[in-house]
C-alpha cells in the first residue's frame, strides 16, 4: 500500500477527516437536546435510553472490525463505506414513525459511525510524521471539544425552527462533502490480492462484545435472568471467538498483535483512563449541583475545563516530543492525570467550583498526553498492514472503559447511599435524583445533602484509584518499541520513537 497524497492535498484530506469526525462527535449531543420533542411526537418513552445506547453499542462493536477491514482493503474505501452507511441510517432516522423504528435506524447509524474514529486516526498516522502528528490530532480533538458545545445549541435551534428530522439529515451534506474530499485528495495504491474476510470472527466478536455492553448498560435495570443470559452469551461467544481467531487465515482480531507488550499495556492504560474519565464526567456535575448547590451552567463549566484541557495538551504534544522526547511526554500525562483526580478528594459542601474545574482541567491535559502518545507509539510500532487494527484496538479500549466506568460509578453511588443513608433518607435521596429538578431541592435539604456528599466520595475515591492505576499502567508501556517486521516496499516506514 502506498499513500500518494501531495503536500498541497493534505490540508484537504485533514479537512475531510475533521468533517467526518464532526458527524460522529456531534451525534450524542445534538440528539439529546431534541429527544423531548421526538418522544412527544413519536411516543414510546420506554425506548428513550436505547436511542443513545443503540448508536453507541453498534459504534463500539464495529470499531475493531473496521480497523481490520481498512488494513485489508485500504483506508479510503472502508471509511467511505462506513460514511455511506451512516448517511443511510441518518436519512431513515428522519423518517422514523415510532421510537422502536428510530432505535433500529440509530443502530444502522452506529454501524456506519464505527468506521470514522479508528480510520481517521489511522489516516493521520499514515500521512504525518511523528513530530507533525500531534498538531493534526489536536485539530481532531478540537472538533470533539467544539461538538460538545455546539451540539446542544444546534439541536435546540433545529427543533425550534425546523423539523426534528433535520438533526439527523444535517449529516447528509456533511457526509457528501467528506466523501468528495476523500475521493479527490486521498489516493491509495492497494496491493491486488484476494483478501479473506473473517465473517465468523466478526460475527462472534459482535455478539460477545454486544452482549457485554448491553449487560453493563442495563446492569441496574434488567431482570436478573436476562443479565445471566447475557453473561452466558458473552462468555460462550467470547471463548469460541478466541479459539476461532487462533486458526483463522485473516483473523478479524490478531491475537498476536493484541498480546504484544506495547499494544497490551497501551490498551490497558487507555481502558483504565477511559473508565476514570467517564467517572469524572458522570459524578462531577451532579456533585456541583447537588452538594455545592450551583446551577447546571456552573456544573457544565467544570466539565468544560476538561474539554479545553484535552485538545490543548494534544495540540502541544508535537512540541513536547521534540523538546523532551515521547517517553517524558507520556510520563507527564501519567502524572497530571492522578493529580487532577486527587482534587476531587478535597471537595466539600463549601468548596468553590473552581477547585473542581482545576482538577477537571488537569485530568483533561493528562488524558490528552496519554492518548496521543499511546496512539503514535502504537502506530509507529507496526507496519501499514496492521496499523488500522492497532489503532482500532486503542479506540475500542477507551470505548469499553467508558462503558465500564458509567456502570461502576453508578454502582459505587448506590452503595454509598445505602451505606450512609438510613432507610428514609436513602429513599428520599433516590426520589429526588429521579426528579427533573431534584438536584435543586436536594442541595437545600442539609441532611440529604450530607448523605449525598458522603455517597459521592465513594465514586471520587474510585476515580482516584483508577487514575493511579492508569499511572502505573503507562509506566509499563515500553516506549521506544520498534516495528517487529519491516514494512513492505513503498509503504511509510515507522518512525523511530525517541526516549
Predicted regions and their residues:
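Transmembrane-helix exit segments and adjacent C-terminal regions of multi-pass membrane proteins
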Residues: 2-13, 17-19, 437-499
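Hydrophobic/small/kink-forming positions within alpha-helical transmembrane segments
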Residues: 60-61, 91, 149, 206, ...
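Helix-loop-helix hairpins in multi-pass membrane proteins, especially solute transporters
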Residues: 63-200, 218
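C-terminal membrane-cytosol helix-exit motif in multi-pass small-molecule transporters
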Residues: 173-190, 206-218, 233-247, 470-478
Amino acid at each position: 500500500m502506498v499513500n500518494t497524497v501531495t503536500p498541497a492535498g493534505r490540508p484537504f484530506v485533514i479537512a475531510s477527516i475533521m468533517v467526518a469526525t464532526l458527524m460522529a462527535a456531534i451525534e450524542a449531543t445534538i440528539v439529546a437536546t431534541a429527544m423531548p420533542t421526538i418522544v412527544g411526537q413519536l411516543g414510546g418513552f420506554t425506548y428513550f435510553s436505547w436511542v443513545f445506547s443503540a448508536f453507541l453499542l453498534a459504534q463500539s462493536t464495529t470499531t475493531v472490525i473496521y480497523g481490520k477491514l481498512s488494513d485489508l482493503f485500504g483506508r479510503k474505501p472502508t471509511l467511505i463505506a462506513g460514511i455511506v452507511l451512516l448517511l443511510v441510517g441518518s436519512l431513515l432516522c428522519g423518517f422514523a414513525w415510532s421510537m422502536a423504528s428510530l432505535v433500529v435506524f440509530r443502530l444502522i447509524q452506529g454501524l456506519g459511525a464505527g468506521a470514522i474514529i479508528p480510520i481517521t486516526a489511522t489516516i493521520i498516522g499514515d500521512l504525518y510524521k511523528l513530530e507533525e502528528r500531534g498538531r493534526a490530532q489536536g485539530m481532531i480533538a478540537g472538533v470533539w471539544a467544539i461538538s460538545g458545545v455546539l451540539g446542544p445549541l444546534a439541536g435546540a435551534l433545529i427543533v425550534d425552527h425546523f423539523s426534528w428530522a433535520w438533526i439527523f439529515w444535517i449529516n447528509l451534506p456533511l457526509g457528501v462533502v467528506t466523501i468528495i474530499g476523500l475521493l479527490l485528495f486521498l489516493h491509495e495504491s492497494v496491493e491486488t490480492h484476494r483478501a479473506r474476510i473473517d465473517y465468523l470472527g466478526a460475527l462472534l466478536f459482535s455478539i460477545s462484545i454486544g452482549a457485554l455492553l448491553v449487560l453493563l448498560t442495563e446492569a441496574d435495570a434488567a431482570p436478573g435472568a436476562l443479565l445471566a443470559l447475557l453473561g452466558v452469551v458473552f462468555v460462550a461467544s467470547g471463548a469460541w471467538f478466541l479459539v476461532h481467531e487462533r486458526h483463522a487465515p485473516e483473523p478479524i482480531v490478531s491475537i498476536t498483535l493484541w498480546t504484544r507488550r506495547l499494544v497490551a499495556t497501551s490498551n490497558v492504560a487507555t481502558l483504565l483512563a477511559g473508565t476514570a474519565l467517564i467517572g469524572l464526567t458522570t459524578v462531577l456535575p451532579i456533585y456541583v449541583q447537588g452538594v455545592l448547590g450551583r446551577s447546571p451552567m456552573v456544573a457544565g463549566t467544570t466539565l468544560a475545563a476538561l474539554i479545553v484541557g484535552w485538545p490543548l495538551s494534544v495540540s502541544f504534544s508535537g512540541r513536547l516530543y521534540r523538546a523532551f522526547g515521547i517517553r517524558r511526554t507520556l510520563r507527564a500525562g501519567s502524572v497530571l492525570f492522578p493529580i487532577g483526580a486527587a482534587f476531587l478528594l478535597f471537595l466539600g459542601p463549601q468548596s468553590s467550583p473552581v477547585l473542581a474545574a482545576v482538577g477537571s482541567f488537569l485530568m483533561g491535559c493528562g488524558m490528552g498526553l496519554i492518548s496521543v502518545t499511546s496512539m503514535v507509539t502504537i502506530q509507529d510500532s507496526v507496519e501499514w498492514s496492521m496499523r488500522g487494527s492497532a489503532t482500532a484496538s486503542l479506540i475500542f479500549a477507551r470505548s469499553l472503559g467508558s462503558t465500564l466506568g458509567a456502570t461502576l460509578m453508578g454502582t459505587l453511588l448506590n452503595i454509598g447511599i445505602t451505606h450512609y443513608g438510613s432507610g428514609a433518607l436513602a429513599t428520599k435521596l433516590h426520589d429526588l435524583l429521579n426528579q427533573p429538578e431534584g438536584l435543586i431541592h436536594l442541595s437545600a435539604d442539609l441532611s440529604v445533602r450530607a448523605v449525598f456528599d458522603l455517597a459521592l466520595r465513594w465514586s471520587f475515591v474510585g476515580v482516584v484509584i483508577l487514575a493511579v492505576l492508569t499511572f502505573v499502567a503507562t509506566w509499563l508501556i515500553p516506549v521506544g518499541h520498534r516495528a517487529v517486521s519491516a514494512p513492505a516496499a513503498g509503504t511509510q516506514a515507522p518512525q523511530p520513537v525517541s526516549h
